[in-house]
């Protein structure tokens, strides 16, 4: 299984990122500015998570090549590529012409469901195969990969999927019509911050309720190498 992850991490950004870009470009009226926003804001957000999680809090580590202090240089593109394809398929159920609040809520629900499940599956087998090492309270207590990942993945990735789905639909609704630069950058900044703050806040809150601690404590020092 680890071989799959080692290959997929290169195939995803090299092969599927251009495909995802083209699909979104077609949906978004062949507008490169809106397509670039939908594709690259998540890339930046996902880089933020891995840099802070690995370097600052030492919550996990990538056991692959190439890495820089446990971080894949291409990590943001790996995750954002899968996300872009998932959300493109999800939003096939929400036509471009639907621009009301219900369209955004539907995109958020679909994103939470799909992204939450598939990232739980991906992360579980990445941990089981040794591709990723996580240093959370559950894994330090001897929990299995399934138990440890299930402790955080549904909330973290589910809320991330909801934010991502809502972000791309808001961008579509507001930016496909004529718009100014101010609105464009407002959507970009708002989407990026939401993708970072909401999943982080949801994870910290649920972890505090379940375990009585913030969820930012690394157990790498008490675990066997």
Predicted regions and their residues:
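Aromatic-rich, lipid-facing transmembrane alpha helices and their immediate juxtamembrane interface loops
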Residues: 1-225
């Amino acid at each position: 299984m680890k071989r799959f992850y080692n290959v997929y991490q290169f195939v995803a950004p090299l092969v599927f990122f251009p495909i995802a870009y083209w699909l979104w470009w077609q949906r978004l009226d062949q507008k490169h500015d809106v397509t670039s926003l939908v594709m690259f804001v998540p890339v930046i957000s996902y880089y933020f998570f891995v840099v802070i999680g690995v370097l600052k809090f030492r919550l996990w580590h990538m056991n692959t090549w190439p890495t820089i202090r446990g971080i894949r240089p291409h990590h943001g593109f790996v995750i954002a590529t899968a996300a872009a394809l998932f959300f493109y398929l999800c939003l096939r159920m929400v036509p471009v012409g639907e621009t009301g609040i219900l369209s955004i809520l539907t995109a958020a629900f679909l994103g939470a469901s799909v992204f939450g499940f598939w990232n739980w599956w991906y992360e579980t087998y990445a941990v089981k195969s040794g591709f990723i090492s996580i240093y959370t309270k559950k894994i330090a207590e001897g929990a299995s990969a399934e138990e440890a990942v299930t402790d955080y993945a549904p909330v973290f990735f589910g809320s991330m999927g909801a934010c991502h789905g809502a972000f791309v639909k808001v961008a579509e609704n507001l930016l496909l019509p004529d718009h100014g630069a101010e609105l464009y950058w407002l959507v970009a900044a708002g989407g990026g911050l939401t993708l970072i703050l909401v999943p982080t806040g949801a994870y910290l809150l649920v972890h505090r309720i379940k375990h009585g601690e913030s969820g930012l404590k690394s157990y790498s020092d008490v675990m066997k190498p």
